[in-house]
């Protein structure tokens, strides 16, 4: 038996007028997920425990079977694992976004336009991060390049600071959301003229692209301690994801991390390549479990792009789930598949909520026959609620 999780990050949403009162999941054409819904079971799950911020870090730990209340030490340390950052117990790790701010006002009066700097390419971001390292790296502060706009700051023997995620404040004046920790606030402020006038950003502006013109720190945490996934479940696991957070969780859990060329973390990602990576892990590499994470619906939610969010869900269905299902069937391999979001990312607010999300659980050996769709509403109507997200994987493995 093989076990597969397909995680459509931020896929759940609310009814949207532009879609005739439907959610993106309802508006999307998803024949494969609907087929599996008719043959499997539906429900809802609370991946984000009450009182915890509704981040992909907390929610994906839950889906993988780790209680965030016991295993979560911050988002950035998990991301740091994926880029090979060596951490000491007293280090504090931060996510260091490169964001787009307005040009003209004093720093505290600038508006944040884009948390992703137009989804800047990693190669371009590394050029800017090298300039940042030349300016700021020392025995206390060390910057590391991650992926696209997502990078890492290590503060040796630092202090955990309360910080605001930039994607929660798009379109807002930044002053009220800047760090209270003076050294962090000053570093962000000093980064602006360095980045804003960088030749690469001048070229981006000339090409009509968003400048990547300021650092933004958030997601502080300390060295993570995550139980080995194989020891915990008895399964050899593989992670397929474009984003450092998920790769870092996998590194911490001792899972195989599959590299996929063209995996971008957005709607232009290599869906087919991710599907093939999962197929190879399960059928060639001896893995029992594959976790396929797709960031695209979440990014489209943050950007407020309704039609693109619908399209990302359709791509998930036709370009990823369909070939994985077909490969398992052609190989004669029994499998169970869990399909779900980690959290909602509603277009209306362009950020995460901690609400319950729909899930679909399919077992190729125990099929029922029913006409069904996989949507938020059909999952709620199933009246099958799991209040502790970290327990849902037990249903996958035990096929309850």
Residue ranges and their predicted role:
Residues 1-400:
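Feature captures the catalytic ectodomains and active-site-proximal regions of enzymes
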């Amino acid at each position: 038996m093989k076990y597969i999780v397909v995680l459509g990050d931020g896929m759940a949403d609310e009814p949207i007028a532009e879609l005739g009162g439907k959610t993106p999941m309802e508006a999307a054409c998803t024949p494969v997920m609907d087929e599996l819904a008719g043959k499997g079971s539906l429900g809802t799950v609370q991946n984000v425990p009450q009182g915890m911020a509704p981040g992909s870090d907390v929610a994906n730990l839950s889906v993988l079977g780790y209680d965030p209340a016991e295993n979560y030490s911050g988002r950035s340390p998990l991301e740091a694992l994926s880029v090979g950052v060596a951490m000491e117990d007293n280090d504090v790790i931060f996510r260091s976004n490169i964001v787009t701010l307005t040009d003209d006002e004093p720093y505290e009066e600038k508006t944040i336009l884009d948390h992703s700097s137009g989804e800047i390419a990693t190669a371009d971001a590394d050029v800017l991060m090298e300039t940042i390292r030349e300016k700021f790296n020392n025995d206390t502060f060390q910057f590391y390049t991650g992926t696209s706009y997502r990078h890492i700051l290590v503060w040796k023997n630092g202090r955990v600071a309360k910080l605001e995620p930039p994607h929660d404040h798009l379109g807002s004046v930044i002053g009220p959301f800047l760090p209270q920790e003076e050294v962090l606030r000053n570093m962000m402020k000093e980064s602006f003229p360095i980045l804003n006038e960088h030749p690469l950003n001048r070229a981006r502006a000339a090409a009509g692209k968003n400048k990547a013109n300021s650092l933004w720190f958030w997601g502080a945490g300390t060295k993570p301690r995550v139980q080995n996934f194989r020891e915990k479940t008895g399964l050899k696991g593989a992670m397929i994801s474009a984003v450092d957070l998920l790769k870092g969780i996998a590194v911490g859990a001792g899972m195989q991390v599959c590299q996929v060329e063209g995996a971008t973390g957005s709607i232009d990602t290599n869906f087919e390549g991710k599907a093939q990576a999962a197929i190879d892990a399960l059928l060639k590499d001896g893995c029992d479990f594959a976790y396929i994470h797709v960031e695209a619906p979440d990014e489209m939610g943050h950007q407020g792009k309704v039609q693109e969010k619908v399209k990302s869900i359709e791509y998930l269905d036709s370009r990823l789930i369909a070939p994985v299902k077909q490969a398992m069937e052609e190989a004669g391999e029994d499998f169970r598949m869990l399909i779900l979001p980690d959290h909602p990312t509603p277009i209306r607010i362009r950020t995460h909520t901690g609400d319950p999300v729909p899930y679909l659980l399919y077992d190729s050996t125990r099929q029922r026959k029913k006409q069904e769709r996989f949507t938020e509403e059909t999952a709620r109507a199933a009246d099958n609620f799991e209040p502790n997200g970290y327990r849902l994987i037990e249903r996958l493995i035990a096929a309850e």
